[in-house]
């Protein structure tokens, strides 16, 4: 599972060859046992969240949007 980014304690990663058929570009985020998934399009869009507060999700979304190009490049490698 490639780690793409680590910022403010959040680990951003994805699984290689996830889903059948392969899912569109997305990123998983974890911190302190909490987990979220964002679709990566023109901006990061929340798919699922388990345990994160609304404030944390806002922070995650800001980080993801700031790093969209990095996430997309890692996905396409």
Locate each region found by the language model:
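Negatively charged, low-complexity tracts enriched in Asp/Glu with abundant Ser/Thr
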Residues: 1-12
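Generic secretory/membrane-interface signal
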Residues: 2-3, 20, 61
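Alpha-helical structural elements
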Residues: 5-7, 33-34, 70
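A short, structured beta-strand/loop element
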Residues: 15-54
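C-terminal structural segments of small proteins and small subunits
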Residues: 51-77
């Amino acid at each position: 599972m490639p780690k793409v980014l680590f910022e403010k304690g959040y680990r951003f990663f994805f699984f290689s060859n996830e889903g059948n058929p392969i899912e569109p570009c997305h990123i998983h985020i974890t911190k302190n046992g909490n987990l979220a998934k964002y679709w990566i399009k023109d901006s990061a869009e929340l798919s699922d969240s388990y345990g994160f507060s609304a404030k944390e999700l806002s922070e995650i979304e800001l980080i993801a949007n700031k790093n969209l190009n990095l996430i997309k490049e890692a996905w396409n490698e």
